[in-house]
Design a protein with these regions (language model features):
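Active-site gating/metal-coordination segments in enzymes
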Residues: 43
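Acidic, Ser/Thr/Gly/Pro-rich intrinsically disordered interaction regions
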Residues: 1-33, 37, 47-60, 77-233
């Protein structure tokens, strides 16, 4: 974040500065806090399914993390295009983006080489774009509440059937007891996905390793980009 501010002070183009300070830097701050909350609410040592509200907190922060991860790359692209007065040359606002050919052909060699690597290409296409697009436009990212063995699944179904049989009978204490037992069954799920119908495009990913890896990627790219963004091709 501080590096974005420092680099913005070296230029006098207000629109470019805004994308660094109020765009990328602000997003990085949100990502840092979201990452912290994910690990606070859902420690790796968790051995019981999370309560529903806690799981929602984790999902909210996962959503914030992923949408801003995508946005950081967009903000860097805008800062670069505006700094070098390339908006018309790239074809207008819809062609601004670190992963869009019209913008990439003007990037410094070091930045382009990094983005064009096999690792980054796969990361962007199979993960970042897929999961961000689903989150923004289709199905939000989801952490299943628990994993059940066959026996646990059968017990859960028995309890659920009894709950339905009590509907309208005002037996609230029994309903609460059934719900409490259901919540205690199973083990936590440490994966996330979006759609259940999109196959490989929504393959389950390990939550904690993924957000750590993403954080490393955006920090690494940020240092590389800010070291070279005064150059253009």
């Amino acid at each position: 974040m501080l590096e974005c501010v420092r680099h913005s002070e070296a230029i006098d183009i207000d629109t470019s500065k805004e994308y660094l300070i109020h765009g990328a830097a602000r997003r990085l701050g949100v990502m840092a806090r979201a990452l912290q909350v994910v690990f606070e609410r859902f420690p790796l040592a968790t051995d019981k399914p999370l309560p529903t509200e806690s799981l929602h907190d984790v999902q909210i922060n996962l959503h914030a993390f992923v949408i801003n991860l995508f946005g950081v790359f967009e903000n860097f692209a805008w800062a670069f295009v505006l700094r070098h007065d390339l908006l018309k040359m790239v074809g207008g606002p819809l062609q601004v983006g670190m992963f869009k050919p019209a913008t990439r052909k003007h990037l410094p060699d070091s930045v382009l080489t990094y983005l064009a690597s096999d690792v980054m290409t796969r990361w962007h296409m199979k993960y970042l774009k897929s999961y961000r697009d689903a989150l923004a436009h289709r199905i939000p990212l989801y952490i299943p509440p628990k994993i059940l063995t066959k026996e646990e699944g059968e017990r859960y179904s028995v309890l659920e059937a009894e709950k339905w049989s009590l509907a309208g009978l005002d037996r609230w204490e029994r309903m609460d007891a059934l719900t409490e037992e259901q919540e205690s069954i199973g083990s936590p799920c440490f994966h996330f996905l979006h759609s259940f119908a999109e196959g490989e495009a929504s393959r389950p990913l390990q939550l904690h390793p993924q957000v750590i890896s993403d954080s490393t990627t955006v920090i690494e790219f940020g240092h590389l980009f800010l070291a070279a963004w005064h150059e253009r091709r």
